[in-house]
Amino acid sequence: MIIKVLILNTKLFFKNIFKVNIFYIKMSKYIVVSGSLSGLGKGTTCACLARSLKQLTDNTVQIIKIDPYLNVNASHMNPFEHGEVFVLEDGTETDLDLGTYERFLDIDLTYENSITSGQVFLDILNSERKGEYNGKTVQLVPHFTDKVLEKIFKIKSDIVIIELGGTVGDNESYIFTEALRQLRIKVGKENFCGIHISYLPILEEMKTKTTQHSVRKLREIGYEPDFIVCRCKKEMKNETKTKISNTCGVSVNNVIDMHDQKDIFDVSQMLFNQNFPQNIIKYFRLPADFSLFTPIKPIININDNIDICIVGKYTNSCNAYLSLENSLIFAGWKNQVNVNIIWMDSENIDENKLHDVKAIIVPGGFGSGRISGKLRAIQIARQNKIPFLGICFGMQLAVIEYFKNVICIEGNSTEIEPDTKIPLFYSNQDLILGNKKIILEKDSSAYEYYKSEEINERHRHRYVFNNYYKNLLDGMKITGSSNFAEIIEIPGQWFMGVQFHPEFKSRPNKVHPLFDNLIFKAK
């Protein structure tokens, strides 16, 4: 009898040990990144950190972007104010930071990786109208915070990095900070790491008061950072790090200097040199091999430079074409040339400069304004055989320009001229979003570049080509189609228009074939 009891107790002991180990293995590690100001580079920090953690540890890494604004998503946001709207594979229209995440991590994100106040409120109000709260008074705490946590826990990954957009202490972000405080309690401190990014202004010397005050705001909410990343114009002195360590209660080794770099692709190397990802790995006690780190930017000597002109509607906004800019940089790396982008407002084009550049790109842009300059840029590219790529609306304008100046037919898009007698492009009613399959003609440049008859590309447009006029395209060919025209070419020169957005799928290690071949032709 005693032996049986011992055997039973032994079995229960090992069974419980097994359960604990399984729970430990499956528990995600959560890293929350907040900021004392908007625009400090939280997205870049998250992307660099995620990439390093993915490289150095045998763990999956995902990122969530929290935007405190009341918009449900970024679809109606003005690019002049907010930058580009980045489209995911599933058609979700998101903040441009998700594009940075995809490029740095080389993964495809979904709608679950983006959380906004508007999205959370919409879910809560829909649930309330359906009676799912059983007559309870619906409140920010616990219902809003619970919904935020529910969305966070939907992401299944070994490591989950959460970027809290906006500014700590603002009315909009306060409730999210409360939700993240609750997250820390639910998962345990050993599975939670707080990173706070603060700006250090320079007035004769670096000032640390702004950092001290923003950390104090976090503490008032019951949440304090484990790491402080300091954004500054120039390299920090050791005494400044020590001062921040003493006043903010963070180890001096966890005070990170993130001073200005030539471009964002140098940031990951700078952070690695300061043992930032290494210290986070040690904080979580994760097995890692630090020798596996490789910078995102290839270490090559590039001496050749080429000028590529982007003629667009939003060129005065530095982030309106961020994915396009990055795609050209990646293509330059692959072809070993420095791509110098000439930004040209479509309302004020410089024809002399257009004749001197190595390639011209007309990107997308909703609305009927600022058209004439784009049409003229397309005409110059076509007539002078300057390599040309028209993206989305740029493709539509390439067709309109060709009809006008080659076929001598004054057609238009109903977006530009609703009462046009020759509607070359008409409204599809619903916005076409996300990944779509496209079939390529085998005797085309597109097929040569993609090396495949079937491709998938991301879309964001409402207007499509009117196939009634297809047979009039004398000298211009439609070489890619879905249920509408997707790609147009002019044989004999590098002239291509695409209805989709190739820039959303270009990565540092997987340069999109259109940008790769455009830069190869231009150099």
Task: Please name every model-derived segment.
Residues 47, 51-52, 353-445, 500, ...:
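Cysteine-nucleophile active-site neighborhood
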Residues 302-303, 335-337, 353-356, 382, ...:
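A structural signal for short secondary-structure junctions
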